[in-house]
């Protein structure tokens, strides 16, 4: 959850609240002068208005063409919750978000994702080319500890016959996975720390266990639970398509999709103060229009 995104969301919510209140009135009184609701609204509109109106507009445009269910949002929400483990509530609080406001942002992100996927070429020709270098997802468990000595201690216990799941519960500092034996969600290439990914994919058989692997998070011992199994294009096509679509969810492709959706929606900005809000999507600005007069 990047700070810039969170700050923008919080400011947009505040701007919406001010707009909903309407009317004048003071928000701050001093002997030197008062700060009115209108002054605060204008200041926030000037600083955050473009970002706010962009998201509201695209929510309307994309929501009319693509459907994101409550179940879709809840699934993504639970993924984040699992990723952050016991720290999730604290992260939301520190970010000035509630579960409701975070889910609102997730819904918008999923709308952009669905639109991008709908505008992506998934012909057999494209997918077969991608299949040449594609690797299936794998499922592994890991035990994460802070230092190498502790990792070697755990490694020795495994060699002595102790169960991986029991040691994960006892030693792992990954609170999101330790209680389920350290098992991670399935992942493919490019999804994990490079050193972790290399060590995981080097395990070829179920039950294989790695030596301690150092990453930015500490030291991992990895167990292969479900190795990669590549069969034929026809049998793997569904997984290949899902993987390819995910690989195409780049900032560049999403921006290209939003430009297309914006053009198709025949958008007209009526507020002169927000004329430049969509300049990145229509290639123009109010200053361009003024200079051409």
Swiss-Prot record:
Record's subcellular location: Cell membrane
Main EC class the enzyme belongs to: isomerase
Lipidation (S-diacylglycerol cysteine): 21
Recorded GO MF terms: peptidyl-prolyl cis-trans isomerase activity
Membrane topology: Lipid-anchor
Keyword Signal: yes
UniProt-listed Enzyme Commission number(s): 5.2.1.8
SUPFAM superfamilies assigned: FKBP-like (SSF54534), Triger factor/SurA peptide-binding domain-like (SSF109998)
GO cellular component: plasma membrane
Pfam families in alphabetical order: Rotamase_3
Gene Ontology biological process terms in this record: protein folding
Domain of life: Bacteria
Broad class of the protein's primary localization: membrane
Stored InterPro entries: Foldase_PrsA, PPIase_dom_sf, PPIase_PpiC, PrsA_foldase, Trigger_fact/SurA_dom_sf
Protein name stated in the entry: Foldase protein PrsA 2
Organism: Listeria monocytogenes serovar 1/2a (strain ATCC BAA-679 / EGD-e)
Gene: prsA2
């Amino acid at each position: 959850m990047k700070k810039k995104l969170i700050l923008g969301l919080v400011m947009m919510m505040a701007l919406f609240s001010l707009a909903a209140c309407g009317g004048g009135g003071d928000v701050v009184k001093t002997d030197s002068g008062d700060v009115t609701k209108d002054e605060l609204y204008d200041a926030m509109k000037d600083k955050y208005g473009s970002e706010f109106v962009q998201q509201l507009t695209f929510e309307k445009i994309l929501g009319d063409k693509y459907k994101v269910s409550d179940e879709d949002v809840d699934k993504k929400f639970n993924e984040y919750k699992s990723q952050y483990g016991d720290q999730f509530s604290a992260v939301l609080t520190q970010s000035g978000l509630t579960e409701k406001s975070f889910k609102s942002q997730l819904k918008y992100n999923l709308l952009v994702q669905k639109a991008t996927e709908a505008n992506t070429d998934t012909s057999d020709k494209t997918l077969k080319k991608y299949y040449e270098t594609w690797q299936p997802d794998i499922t592994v468990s890991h035990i994460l500890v802070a230092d190498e000595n502790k990792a070697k201690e755990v490694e020795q216990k495994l060699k002595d016959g102790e169960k991986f799941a029991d040691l994960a519960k006892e030693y792992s500092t990954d609170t999101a996975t330790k209680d389920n034996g350290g098992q991670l969600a399935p992942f493919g290439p490019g999804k994990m720390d490079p050193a972790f990914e290399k060590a995981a994919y080097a395990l070829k058989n179920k039950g294989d266990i790695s030596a301690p692997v150092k990453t930015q998070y500490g030291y991992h011992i990895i167990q292969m639970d479900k190795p990669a199994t590549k069969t034929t294009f026809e049998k793997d096509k569904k997984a290949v398509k899902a993987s390819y679509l995910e690989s195409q969810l780049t900032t560049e492709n999403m921006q290209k999709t939003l430009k297309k959706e914006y053009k198709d929606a025949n958008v007209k900005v009526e507020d002169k103060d927000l004329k430049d809000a969509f300049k990145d999507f229509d290639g123009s600005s109010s200053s361009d229009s003024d200079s051409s007069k």
